[in-house]
Every structure is written in structure tokens, then in C-alpha cells.
Amino acid sequence: MTPIKVVVHGASGKMGQEVLKTLCQENNLLPVGAVDIRAKSPALPLPDGSGSIPYSADLSSVLSQTKPDVMVDFTIAKASMPAIRIAAAHKVNLVIGTTGFSPEEISEIEQLAKTNDIGIIVAPNFALGAIIMVHLAQEASRFLASAEVIELHHDKKLDSPSGTALATAAAMLKTRGEAFNKPAKENMSDARGQEHDGIRVHSVRLPGLLAHQEVIFGAAGQSLTIRHDAFSRECYMPGVVLAIKEIVQTKGFVFGLDKLLKL
């Protein structure tokens, strides 16, 4: 089987480095290029010591030179959108782990997939446990009408609430089909997080954390808590590998890893 050639955008970031390390360990995936605004040399040594790959801040140049099948993007929305447009113009499939996109930007990404006849997946979270957490929260939403989401991340995360928290609330509302219950009285509404049709979403940013989320349901005489904890970025890699392998066989736009898992 011919290896899938992959370029990593955001290669010097922590997620980008983890992706490169994983690509080196996978028999059917081949890292062929790296892009980052901090690139200062034309080549980036691979984590396993097997050689080096083209490295530049100029995405178009790297794509032209390496002709990859897939670009993996873990950056920020402000940097990601221009890169997505460039990669789509080069007919490169995309696996996007960046969060913080506006609804308008998501619509543009979907249109880019159609116009350029490529596959694009945007996933707020690649941890399989987190995907299952959202699925379980959806199931609970069918029966329990009061819920809140608390997401906790490291203090360097720029967007809040997290993409996973927003996707969780949206999935819960879609499954329930109506708004969740709101408290009858709130004296300090600004202390209650961001509201999404009755679901309050709270964000915590502290050093020492990585990525954690819990969904708490309440009903008369009981509560249900569904929680996921990510202790290292390694937990995201099986989902990233799955997305890379699937997106080369997919045309169009996919939002969420759950679609590939068929949950």
C-alpha cells in the first residue's frame, strides 16, 4: 500500500510535534513537509531521527514541493483559515484540529470542500474518549432536562468556551429537540457561564491542566456526571490517524470525529 503523504501545519506547536512523532510511527503514513510561522531553517529533523523534511513558513511553497495527500492543521483560527484556502486550492485533503471558527468560517470551509472536490474534516476533539463522552451526554439529554457543561484547559488555550464544549452543548440540544430547563431565579447571571438554550457552559483556564470536561445533569433527588480527562496529547493521536486515513477516501465536508466512528 502506498503511504499517505502528510504535511503538518503548525509543526512547531505541541500538537504539531505530537502529530509528527505519530506519523513517523505509522507504516502507512509518511510525513513529507512541515509548515510554521516560526520556521527558521529549510529542513526540520524528524522526531525519530530518520531524516528531515522541507520546513517553511510558506505553505504554498511546501505544498508545491511535496505534493501531499493530506494536510493536518493544529494552529489557531486566524492562521488556519488562510492555510485552509491555500491547501484547498492545491487540491489537498484536510484534517483540521484547530478550534474557534465562526459559523461563517465553517460554512466557507464546507464550500471549499465542495468547490475543490476534496475531503475536509473539522473536529473539535480527536480523543476517542471525548467523542464517547459527547455521545453519552446526547443519550442522557433524551431523559434529563437540566444540564451544565464545565470545561477545564491549560492557561495557554486562547478560545473559550472550548470547541468541544460548544459542540457538546449543540449535540445535546439537537438530541433533546428543545431547550433545557433554566433556574427560576438567578441573582448573578454573569457568574453563571455562557448560556446555550438552558445549558450553562463554564470555562476554567489554569496552569497544570491539559484538557478536561464534565457534563452534569440534575433531576429531583439525583445527578449524573459524565467526565473525560486528557492527561497527555498522545490521547488525540488515534483519532488523528483515523481521520487522515478516512479523509483521503472522502469527498466533501465532515464536522466531528463521531461521523467517522458512526456513533
Curated annotation (Swiss-Prot):
Q: Which Gene3D superfamilies match?
A: Dihydrodipicolinate Reductase, domain 2, NAD(P)-binding Rossmann-like Domain
User: EC annotation?
Assistant: 1.17.1.8
Q: Name one GO biological process term.
A: diaminopimelate biosynthetic process
Q: Which InterPro entries match?
A: DapB_C, DapB_N, DapB_N_CS, DHDPR_bac, NAD(P)-bd_dom_sf
In this chain, NADP(+) is annotated as bound at 38
Which pathway, per its entry? Amino-acid biosynthesis; L-lysine biosynthesis via DAP pathway; (S)-tetrahydrodipicolinate from L-aspartate: step 4/4
Q: Indicate yes or no for the key word NAD.
A: yes
State a GO cellular component annotated for this protein: cytosol
Known catalytic reactions:
(S)-2,3,4,5-tetrahydrodipicolinate + NAD(+) + H2O = (2S,4S)-4-hydroxy-2,3,4,5-tetrahydrodipicolinate + NADH + H(+); (S)-2,3,4,5-tetrahydrodipicolinate + NADP(+) + H2O = (2S,4S)-4-hydroxy-2,3,4,5-tetrahydrodipicolinate + NADPH + H(+)
Task: Please give one Gene Ontology molecular function term for this protein.
Answer: NADP binding
In this protein, the active site sits at 153, 157
Q: Which Pfam families match?
A: DapB_C, DapB_N
Where is this protein chiefly located?
cytoplasm
Q: Where does NAD(+) bind?
A: 10-15, 97-99, 123-126
Which locations, inside or outside the cell, does it occupy?
Cytoplasm
Q: Which domain of life is it from?
A: Bacteria
Keyword annotations of the record: Amino-acid biosynthesis, Cytoplasm, Diaminopimelate biosynthesis, Lysine biosynthesis, NAD, NADP, Oxidoreductase
Query: In which family does this protein belong, per the annotation?
Result: Belongs to the DapB family.
NCBIfam families with a match to the protein in the record: dapB
> What role does this protein play?
Catalyzes the conversion of 4-hydroxy-tetrahydrodipicolinate (HTPA) to tetrahydrodipicolinate.
Name used for this protein in its record: 4-hydroxy-tetrahydrodipicolinate reductase
Taxonomy of origin reads:
Bacteria, Bacillati, Chloroflexota, Dehalococcoidia, Dehalococcoidales
